[in-house]
Amino acid sequence: MIEVAKLYSIEFMSKEGKSVNTLDKNCSLIIPLAENPDFLIKDIKERKYPENIILIIKHTEDILQNTDSPFSSSEALTIKGYKRAHEYGLFDMFEDDKVKLASQPSKSKTFIIEDIKDINAFVRMVWAHFDVGLRWRMSEEERKIIETNRKFGFYR
């Protein structure tokens, strides 16, 4: 039996002041036929993320899961992260090796989304690998304190 799956592209965006930076352009999500795929898609889109993170999901095409899909049934969601060389910047999502250059792609993770538990696991995995700066924003006063301490050698 050939199942039709929905293929979505995913982008994580970060709002830094007035500008918007793309965290990752190389994401794809395949949601196979489930009991209620529309509910799964709605749940992903309505998830609450930190205020400076935007998750964009766009439907790109329908594919035949058993013929046209480049993924196996256990490999449906592929996300790649790239390192940014900036002290307060955005680091890659999934890179374990922190000595790689900014231009080198990181390791990817793959998931298939079939129910809400899979979405929860995906969201936990993403936030576990985001740089802390994306979840905790320093105030101007906190930033000045850190910069002053750094001048006196209290931080590396």
Swiss-Prot record:
It comes from the Viruses. InterPro entries: Mrh-like (IPR056941). Pfam families: T4_MRH (PF24070). This is Uncharacterized 18.3 kDa protein in modB-mrh intergenic region. It comes from Enterobacteria phage T4 (Bacteriophage T4). The lineage of its organism: Viruses, Duplodnaviria, Heunggongvirae, Uroviricota, Caudoviricetes.
